Amino acid sequence: MKSLLFVTIAVYFVAQAVTANLLSNFLGSSLIDDDKGNMHKLYKRSEDQCIGRSCTCDTSSTSCCPYAACRCNLWKTSCKCQRTGRKWATPCKEIYSPN
């Protein structure tokens, strides 16, 4: 019984591998290249986003928008992006995209 189950699972995985190989040969490698490009665009978009002023931030990253810095109280809690210098930062939005 165990050997029959093992053979069934092995045949299933071989069939999946053959189907995937035939499908990739039929469609070409353009789908794989497109996926890599799309993932790069998604990663780039997440880099462009920042946290607006007066919103909660994390001190371990530079996630605040330009002209804002992540500042915490004495006990390193309730950290928020606050204005730096004389220039004004963006209004509070949880995720702000400058582009």
From Swiss-Prot:
Expressed in which tissues: Expressed by the venom gland.
Primary location recorded for the protein, binned into one broad class: secreted
Top-rank taxon: Eukaryota
TM stretches of this protein: none
Signal peptide region: 1-19
KW Secreted (keyword) present: yes
InterPro entries for the chain: Spidertoxin (IPR004169)
Modification note: Contains 5 disulfide bonds.
One GO cellular component term noted in the UniProt record for this chain: extracellular region
GO-annotated molecular function: ion channel inhibitor activity; toxin activity
Subcellular location: Secreted
Keyword vocabulary terms for this entry: Disulfide bond, Secreted, Signal, Toxin
Residue ranges listed under propeptide: 20-45
UniProt keyword Transferase, yes or no: no
Similarity section: Belongs to the neurotoxin 02 (plectoxin) family.
Protein name: U8-agatoxin-Ao1a
